[in-house]
Structures are given as structure tokens and as C-alpha cells.
Amino acid sequence: ATYGDPGLKKCNESDVPRPISAYGGSKLMMEMLCKDYMTAYGLSSVGLRYFNAAGADPEAEIGELREKETHIVPLAINAARQGKTFKIFVDKYPTEDGTCVRDYVHVMDLADAHIKALNYASENLTSEVFNLGSGAPASNKELLETVQKYTGKMNIEIWGNRPGDPAYLV
């Protein structure tokens, strides 16, 4: 969110942030406030820039409950299981298959990263940000092909590009 639309290149922590949404702007503002607090008061912090969180607790002990699901992985799986049509935004993105490319990172890896970030901040006088991704990007089309591999054929409805959706966010 803080990088905005980086074009077709991998995001690096040293890239200049250019948020294109209020959400991205608010994340960047918090990073800047944390850096100011470190300078003024010696309070260390670590900002974690996730890409796309996905997955669930393998023990099924904890989870999340949303009134309206917005994430592609559970939406696609639910559509396949219920025989509903899945809407995909495609064909105009400048990527190999015309769909958005994202880096999905498992929620358990994110939980582990949070613990490591807390330890790092408690052991160092610092205010840093780190990208958190899997390093294995997938396009929306590839993601849907994987869902279909395990659930069977899906009904897919193709829509045009979604405004403000970067083509490549890795």
C-alpha cells in the first residue's frame, strides 16, 4: 500500500513510497511517526510492509471473521465450493497473462515475522521497515487455476481493470 503502483518491478524497502490510497498514506504516516518518536524519545519500532496475506492457522485454533469477504483466495475457494460465479479483473494489465500479479505470504509466516520484529526492536535502537512477502509471486489467473486444480472447474466472469489496482505488487 505504501509503494502505490511500482510498475512492473519488485518493491524494495529503499524505494520511495508513493501511496495511491488513504490506507497506504496512513501506513506511511505511521512509519514516519515511529521514526520521529525514535529520534525524539528513543522508542524503537519496526514497520512491516506485507504484500498479500493468505492462509489460515493450520491447527484451526484461531481465524478471522469478516462481515464481507474481500480477499481473492477465500472468495475463489468459496465460489468454487458453492458453484457460484467468480468475477476476475483481467485482460488489460501489462503482465504476462493480463491479470494482476501479487506476492502471497502465509499468515503463520507473518505471525513469526511479528515476533522477530518485536525482538529486533527491543534489542536495537532503530526505526526500520521491512517488506514481507513469499518471493513467489502469482497472477490472479494462476491463483484461479490452482483453486480449480483442487476444487474442479469454476464459473469465471471476466471484468475490466479495477481502478487503482496496480498490475504488479511484489
For the regions a protein language model found, what residue spans apply to each?
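A short secondary-structure junction motif
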Residues: 3-4, 9, 57, 83, ...
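Alpha-helical structural signal
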Residues: 47, 73, 111-114
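Short coil-to-beta-strand
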Residues: 1, 46, 84-88
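Catalytic helix-loop patch of NAD(P)-dependent Rossmann-fold dehydrogenases
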Residues: 2-52, 59-71
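C-terminal substrate-binding subdomain of Rossmann-fold SDR/epimerase-dehydratase oxidoreductases
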Residues: 78-170
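C-terminal helical subdomain
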Residues: 68-81
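Feature marks short, surface-exposed loop/turn motifs that line or immediately flank catalytic pockets
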Residues: 3, 54, 136-138
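Hydrophobic pocket-lining residues within nucleotide cofactor-binding pockets
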Residues: 53-54, 93
